[in-house]
């Protein structure tokens, strides 16, 4: 059955990027910073990313994460709205404030795209639970 809307999520979904592509689910990537350098949570697209991350940990370097900001959500959502209505299942508000930025961006875009539907859902779960929720919605 073909969906009548675009389903999107964040890279914290704990599913392989190839799986997300096969299900036609756009992903918004979180980032982390080590020693002032920003890295993308690329969901395994770069084969060196995970070994690099673990080398940081082994060296005692603690990666710092941050929320996805409103501007990043605006850009991501707008690109999806050009194609159709959007349901974004966000990473849990219990571990990140990003969902609040997603809601703020959605409100701004609803004014710009009054004929489009943009719904942001707080998954209230993380890791594999988040992945299962997105998979079920797909």
Residue spans for each PLM region:
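N-terminal glycine-rich phosphate/adenylate-binding segment common to multiple enzyme folds
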Residues: 72-102
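Short amphipathic alpha-helical segments at helix-loop
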Residues: 57-61, 87-90, 118
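Active-site histidine-anchored catalytic micro-motif
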Residues: 91, 96-138
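N-terminal glycine-rich anion-binding loop in soluble enzyme alpha/beta folds
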Residues: 6-72
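A short helix-to-beta-strand connector/capping loop
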Residues: 3-4, 22-25, 113-117
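Local beta-strand N-terminus motif with an aromatic residue
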Residues: 4-5, 83
């Amino acid at each position: 059955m073909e969906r009548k809307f675009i389903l999107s999520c964040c890279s914290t979904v704990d599913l392989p990027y190839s799986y997300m592509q096969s299900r036609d689910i756009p992903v918004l990537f979180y980032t982390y910073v080590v020693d002032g350098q920003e890295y993308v949570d690329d969901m395994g697209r770069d084969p060196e990313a995970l070994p690099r991350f673990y080398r940081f940990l082994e060296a005692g370097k603690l990666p710092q994460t941050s929320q996805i900001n409103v501007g990043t959500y605006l850009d991501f959502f707008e690109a999806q709205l050009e194609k159709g209505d959007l349901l974004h299942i966000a990473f849990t508000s219990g571990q990140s404030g990003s969902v609040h930025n997603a809601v703020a961006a959605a409100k701004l875009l609803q004014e710009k795209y009054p004929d489009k539907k943009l719904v942001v859902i707080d998954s209230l779960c993380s890791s594999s639970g988040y992945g299962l929720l997105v998979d079920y919605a797909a």
